[in-house]
Amino acid sequence: MKYDVVVIGGRVAGSTAAYHAARLGLSVLLLERNPEIGTPVQCAGGVSDSFFKSTGLKPLPEFTCTRIRAAAVNGPLGARIVTENPVVRGYILERKSLDKYLALRAAEAGADVLTMSIAGDLIFREGSVSGVVFRGPDGVQEVECGMVIAADGVQSSIARKAGLETGFRPADLCSCVQYEVAGVDVDPETMEFYFGSRFAPSGYLWVFPKGEGRANVGLGIRRKSCSERGPLSYLNRFMEERGFKRIEFNAGAVPVCGPIERTFTDGLLVVGDAAGQVDPLTGGGIHLAAECAKIAGEVAAEAIESGRVDGRFLSRYEMRWRKKIGKNLERSLKFRKILDGLGDEELDALLRSLEGKDLSSISKISLLRILKDYPSMLRILRDIL
């Protein structure tokens, strides 16, 4: 077998990269380790309207559950604010269905898709990645290619085999657990977030409505906070207090340390969770993965067309994605580090300072004015305002 591009990983990042490479005329092979694309689910499923604007996708009923118009943030000591800021407007997705839709779109654009296919090693020619060794339903196989796009998740081994430093430390990871629940009475248009040591130390708990009495209820906490109690114990207590009925369980890890230092090398690009292209504050990665994967697919097409798959040429991928989302990631990382340092009383005070305010168009300037009477909050936030 021989292809222009082999994409490893069939989730949002991999399928999106495969689609854009294929639509630009490349021969593409997409390898997914699981028997079924979209499972197991490792995502809460919330996206903003900007996801659809930037990807060109339409919020089709095949993979959207509910329209979100507001977000409620609950503090550890009772503070609560609700915002209808345009930035929170979006949809809750049926993630399994989205992943399948994106893989189907890639296939319709011309990509070959193989499930139950685990990439185990890379093939090199003159120091450049030039193929993949994988184990599929028919045994171990080798495939030659012009280049590889690694979208194999937070524990990416492929990028490391190419010489890139992608190993995340335990302190860099957020442990996430989630139930899909039934029989819940929640506002179908409002996402709920809970902060504080009781709910999710160094993280947050979420309730995302899916309509018809269903919701995704989960939490993510930093690994450093898991020494005494695991994330599941916090989630189970919340579930028991509210009497939610569990119908599905999912778990995973998310890198919240910002992107890896380098996302390219000779013959290979890294995208999505494998590259740390995740919002360090929220842990959200669907939108960022799609943005960066589009760039990866386009750069792959440019590289194959020009006959240049060396790292110097492929560095344009990193320059483009950092220009597009780099500043936002840096800002989110600062916010996350500051929030990590807040105790329950400070978190609640911050939320109470915003109660009754018009949050529909809040900006950093207006936030400064709101907090002018809270010197301790200004001290905490001064690095990012």
Curated annotation (Swiss-Prot):
Q: Which reaction does it catalyse?
A: a 2,3-bis-O-phytanyl-sn-glycerol 1-phospholipid + 8 A = a 2,3-bis-O-(geranylgeranyl)-sn-glycerol 1-phospholipid + 8 AH2; 2,3-bis-O-(phytanyl)-sn-glycerol 1-phosphate + 8 A = 2,3-bis-O-(geranylgeranyl)-sn-glycerol 1-phosphate + 8 AH2; CDP-2,3-bis-O-(geranylgeranyl)-sn-glycerol + 8 AH2 = CDP-2,3-bis-O-(phytanyl)-sn-glycerol + 8 A; archaetidylserine + 8 AH2 = 2,3-bis-O-phytanyl-sn-glycero-3-phospho-L-serine + 8 A
List the coiled-coil residues: none
EC number(s) from the headed UniProt entry:
1.3.-.-
Name the GO cellular-component terms.
membrane
What does the record say about how the cofactor binds? Binds 1 FAD per subunit.
Molecular function via GO:
flavin adenine dinucleotide binding; geranylgeranyl reductase activity; oxidoreductase activity, acting on the CH-CH group of donors, NAD or NADP as acceptor
Q: Any miscellaneous information on file?
A: Reduction reaction proceeds via syn addition of hydrogen for double bonds.
Which protein are we looking at? Answer: Digeranylgeranylglycerophospholipid reductase 2
Organism expressing this protein natively: Methanothermobacter thermautotrophicus (strain ATCC 29096 / DSM 1053 / JCM 10044 / NBRC 100330 / Delta H)
